[in-house]
């Protein structure tokens, strides 16, 4: 089924070129289908890239989804064309009276800051509180997962000695959740984090389940079944070249950055990386949309 996105959103042109089925919002209004309503709080500076990655995985399912994109009002993004935000994004105040089937909160490059030092922390916690009643199921990604975990459960992030960066093997720890239905026992996931959450602190919370983790990279996927909240600490939705762009960006800035592990063929950054995580990414997002967003609606 198609994903419904604004007619002129750059992501639509990219996905159409990949033969991904998209539908403009004007066309969608002419059909008699109730699409799942998913709101995405995009905190990334690379907004077009991130919205495209999320739209891509949500489009490749049997369920029709309409995306609503929002950005923070308390912090004005500086890396995105203001016209893009005006044309395709709303603020929280503009959508707070609506009900949504799903909420996705992205990561953000603010991992090493204390929570209260994040310009939009108060606004984010307001959105998280709003989601308790206004959203059926939530998916939090990377820093977004750490922020939601701290807000809802008081679990703090811990700073790593060095950035955890590369493509790491992960394994299923708990197969009871429909979120991991059909997953392989072991799978690869792109990781790009300066911080982590400690497993022992998660296990102390009876309502949280650790579904997948890595002996090298730590926790990957948590689930709060009762509250329909999914915490995803890594980036299965990443493109083939995302880690490459992050690596070259940090090198150009003179930041301390190691070669992403298990990513470039022969660890040679002059070679083109090969995607080995796409099927896991698609299955995870499909399961979330089906079992956490759609099926509770149909009961």
From Swiss-Prot:
Its main location: cytoplasm. Keywords: Acyltransferase, Amino-acid biosynthesis, Cytoplasm, Methionine biosynthesis, Transferase. The active site is at 142 (acyl-thioester intermediate), 235 (proton acceptor), 237. It is an enzyme of class 2 (transferase). The record marks 192 as: Important for substrate specificity. Substrate binds at residues 163, 192, 249. Pathway: Amino-acid biosynthesis; L-methionine biosynthesis via de novo pathway; O-acetyl-L-homoserine from L-homoserine: step 1/1. GO terms for molecular function: homoserine O-acetyltransferase activity; homoserine O-succinyltransferase activity. One of its GO terms (cellular component) is cytoplasm. CDD domains: GATase1_HTS. It catalyses: L-homoserine + acetyl-CoA = O-acetyl-L-homoserine + CoA. Its EC number is 2.3.1.31. InterPro entries: Class_I_gatase-like (IPR029062), HST_MetA (IPR005697), MetA_family (IPR033752). One of its GO terms (biological process) is L-methionine biosynthetic process from homoserine via O-succinyl-L-homoserine and cystathionine. The record marks 111 as: Important for acyl-CoA specificity. SUPFAM superfamilies: Class I glutamine amidotransferase-like (SSF52317). It is found in: Cytoplasm. Belongs to the MetA family. Transfers an acetyl group from acetyl-CoA to L-homoserine, forming acetyl-L-homoserine. This is Homoserine O-acetyltransferase. It comes from Synechococcus elongatus (strain ATCC 33912 / PCC 7942 / FACHB-805) (Anacystis nidulans R2). The gene is metAA.
């Amino acid at each position: 089924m198609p994903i419904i996105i604004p007619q002129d959103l750059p992501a639509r042109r990219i996905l159409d070129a990949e033969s991904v089925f998209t539908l403009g919002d004007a066309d969608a209004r002419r059909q008699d289908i109730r699409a799942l309503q998913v709101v995405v709080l995009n905190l990334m500076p690379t907004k077009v890239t991130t919205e495209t990655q999320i739209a891509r995985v949500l489009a490749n399912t049997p369920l029709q989804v309409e995306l609503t994109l929002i950005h923070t009002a308390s912090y004005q993004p500086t890396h995105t064309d203001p016209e893009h935000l005006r044309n395709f994004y709303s603020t929280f105040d503009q959508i707070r009276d609506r009900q949504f089937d799903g909420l996705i909160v992205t990561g953000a490059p603010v991992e090493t800051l204390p929570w209260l030092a994040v310009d939009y922390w108060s606004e984010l916690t307001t959105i998280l509180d709003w989601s308790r009643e206004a959203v059926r199921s939530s998916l939090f990604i990377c820093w977004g997962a750490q922020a939601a975990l701290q807000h809802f459960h008081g679990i703090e992030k811990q700073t790593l000695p060095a950035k955890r960066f590369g493509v790491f093997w992960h394994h299923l720890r708990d197969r009871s959740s429909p979120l991991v239905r059909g997953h392989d026992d072991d799978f690869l996931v792109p990781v790009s984090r300066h911080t982590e959450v400690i497993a022992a602190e998660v296990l102390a919370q009876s309502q949280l389940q650790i579904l997948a983790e890595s002996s090298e990279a730590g926790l990957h996927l948590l689930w709060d079944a009762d509250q329909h909240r999914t915490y995803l600490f890594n980036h299965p939705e990443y493109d083939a070249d995302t880690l490459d762009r992050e690596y070259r960006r940090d090198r150009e800035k003179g930041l301390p950055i190691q070669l992403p592990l298990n990513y470039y063929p022969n660890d040679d950054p002059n070679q083109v990386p090969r995607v080995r995580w796409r099927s896991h990414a698609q299955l995870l997002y499909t399961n979330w949309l089906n079992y956490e967003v759609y099926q509770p609606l149909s009961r």
